């Protein structure tokens, strides 16, 4: 048996090829799996459950079917932090706190999206702190749908422009933040996404940090079992 982790699919109506690849993954890669964890940024943007795009509603139906036989867990990312209980229930996903500790085949493991570890990106961390306030999210949800969509598009555009100007170091995790989380959670394994830099890192010769990759050019999935870990890519099918 094994547990699967994915993240950073950034699904959108503009890239339905990624949605198709994800559907194939759900159809073919879940044999003998104990659970599926989605570590955030399942969608490129999410402005509210009441504005879910048709492709997202179709995906929710697919996930709901999968969840009848396989538990699906979801941690919010920086792109889909407004995804709520309404859509999660429709998709059969169980929402988890942004930092969650689980026992994985005898190894205590902390899982998260990963944006909280990029502490050198001060501008983003200020925005992240603002969006963490329930009152801010509530005020946003009260805005007219067109206004919410416009704000989301603006944030997305600014983020893409800003990221092009930021250094590699600033956009990666900060080692001190990683070490602090290991100490705080008393774990020896960490699994996250966000940076789009899939790798398995050994920290201080004692802990393991695994980064799942994005799905822009190919899929990425981490399989964890009692025998160890396997981080692999999933090439998209070409027609």
From Swiss-Prot:
GO terms for biological process: lipid A biosynthetic process. It is found in: Cell inner membrane. It is an enzyme of class 3 (hydrolase). InterPro entries: Calcineurin-like_PHP_ApaH (IPR004843), LpxH-like (IPR043461), Metallo-depent_PP-like (IPR029052), UDP-diacylglucosamine_Hdrlase (IPR010138). Mn(2+) 1 binds at residues 8, 10, 41, 196. Mn(2+) 2 binds at residues 41, 78, 113, 194. GO terms for cellular component: cytoplasm; extrinsic component of plasma membrane. CDD domains: MPP_YbbF-LpxH (cd07398). Keywords: Cell inner membrane, Cell membrane, Hydrolase, Lipid A biosynthesis, Lipid biosynthesis, Lipid metabolism, Manganese, Membrane, Metal-binding. Its EC number is 3.6.1.54. It catalyses: UDP-2-N,3-O-bis[(3R)-3-hydroxytetradecanoyl]-alpha-D-glucosamine + H2O = 2-N,3-O-bis[(3R)-3-hydroxytetradecanoyl]-alpha-D-glucosaminyl 1-phosphate + UMP + 2 H(+). It is a peripheral membrane protein. Its cofactor is Mn(2+). It comes from the Bacteria. Pathway: Glycolipid biosynthesis; lipid IV(A) biosynthesis; lipid IV(A) from (3R)-3-hydroxytetradecanoyl-[acyl-carrier-protein] and UDP-N-acetyl-alpha-D-glucosamine: step 4/6. Hydrolyzes the pyrophosphate bond of UDP-2,3-diacylglucosamine to yield 2,3-diacylglucosamine 1-phosphate (lipid X) and UMP by catalyzing the attack of water at the alpha-P atom. Involved in the biosynthesis of lipid A, a phosphorylated glycolipid that anchors the lipopolysaccharide to the outer membrane of the cell. Belongs to the LpxH family. HAMAP family: LpxH (MF_00575). NCBIfam families: lipid_A_lpxH, PRK05340.1. This is UDP-2,3-diacylglucosamine hydrolase. It comes from Shewanella oneidensis (strain ATCC 700550 / JCM 31522 / CIP 106686 / LMG 19005 / NCIMB 14063 / MR-1).
